[in-house]
Amino acid sequence: MVLKKRSDKNSFNNRTPTGVPGFDLLCEGGLYRNSINAVLGGPGSGKTTFLLQFLYNGVTLYNENGLYLSFESHDEDIFLDAINYGWDFQKLVNDGKIRIIRFSPKTSIEDIRKQIEKVIINHNIKRICIDPVSILSIRLENELLIREILYDLTTALKRMNITTILADETPEGGVDSFSLGGDEVRSRAVKFLCDGLINFYSSGIGGETDRAVRITKMRRTNHKRGPVPFKITDKGIVVNSK
């Protein structure tokens, strides 16, 4: 289903296209430019593939440099995941088109923010993926403090004209739930701050209806409601938007 655009203010110029086949048709041409978006789903649902595809397409299709911020995966793991779909991240890193930074979970939010801002300026970054976002607040239990810290980070990214995707897992069986690391305090904070919420589902039973994506929130966007089936092919995610 192709959605009808509402006005010129939602034109392509105000969008950051993901380049994921079929997905951008669900949300008026892509993510709202300079927005903060969360991609949620269980293990194996397609979150990491979506992030890598977003960054790869940013460079190869739209000439936008990207930053992958990780707290778990090593560079080599990311290269191996990407090359399965024909995406040569190692070459893009060598060419300075994509940067990968791996932080320790003990790194302070302030140090993370400073390093991100430095990379953005030095490498003309336009797209950022953070995986997983729960690590940013895992040591905090006070909701107001979590909101303050995440607000400072996301505000800085918006100020620097960055379109950001945060990724994390939903609990087992939590089809419509939003949970980061199983902690509802952090969940509410991130849910409040994000402009877009995108859920990936996988039943694990196989077949045409095994996987679906659902945009549950996207500000300033007349997005498709309800789950839409997708496949993970040898070239990445393909959404059935018809």
Residue ranges and their predicted role:
Residues N13-P17, S45-T48, Y68-F71, E143-L144, ...:
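Conserved phosphate/pyrophosphate-binding and hydrolysis machinery centered on Walker-type P-loop NTPases
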Residues E72-E76, S104-I109, S134-I135, T164, ...:
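Conserved nucleotide-binding/hydrolysis micro-motifs of P-loop NTPases
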Residues D77-K106, I116, I121-H123, S137, ...:
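Mobile, glycine- and charge-enriched loop segments
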